Amino acid sequence: MAAGRLRILFLLLLSLHLGLGWVLDLQEAPAADELSSGKMAETGRTWKPHQGNNNVRLPRALPGLCRLWSLTLPVAELGLGYASEEKIIFRYCAGSCPQEVRTQHSLVLARLRGQGRAHGRPCCQPTSYADVTFLDDHHHWQQLPQLSAAACGCGG
């Protein structure tokens, strides 16, 4: 436990020293497996870029491209009717999709959009899913198949 806290403190100090301006957020952030320690997900702690206004000039960030994000939620907040005090990590996809995706489908779709015959833009969506398992209030294991996104990509 102390080693985990020390690692978090080290990462925080290093990021501030490098001018990255990252802070710890307990609600919404990029998936924890993007960090060096996968144990962040177990505690519900994830990282996201600092958005406050302090005197540190932040480096210009890349546009928010399609990627995996995570939220730590109580099972009851899923709205699926399960009674449980457990918290789960719900992963989802969000971000923008570049127009340069080069598949036959995307090339034809881009041409049709240019002619006004097709609508919409490529969207960020899960390319694979993961099952989520939790213990309900009656001490029974519940498995929710394909509840959480496992990988993201641009489609459409």
Curated annotation (Swiss-Prot):
It comes from the Eukaryota. One of its GO terms (cellular component) is extracellular space. GO terms for molecular function: glial cell-derived neurotrophic factor receptor binding; growth factor activity; receptor tyrosine kinase binding. PROSITE patterns: TGF_BETA_2. GO terms for biological process: branching involved in ureteric bud morphogenesis; glial cell-derived neurotrophic factor receptor signaling pathway; peripheral nervous system development. Keywords: Disulfide bond, Growth factor, Secreted, Signal. Disulfide bonds join 66-124, 93-152, 97-154. It holds the Pfam family TGF_beta. The keyword Oxidoreductase does not apply. Residues 1-21 form the signal peptide. It is found in: Secreted. Expressed at low levels in substantia nigra. Cochlea. Belongs to the TGF-beta family. GDNF subfamily. Homodimer; disulfide-linked. Interacts with GFRA4 coreceptor and RET: forms a 2:2:2 ternary complex composed of PSPN ligand, GFRA4 and RET receptor. PANTHER family: GDNF SUBFAMILY OF TGF-BETA FAMILY (PTHR12173), PERSEPHIN (PTHR12173:SF8). Growth factor that exhibits neurotrophic activity on mesencephalic dopaminergic and motor neurons. Acts by binding to its coreceptor, GFRA4, leading to autophosphorylation and activation of the RET receptor. This is Persephin. It comes from Rattus norvegicus.
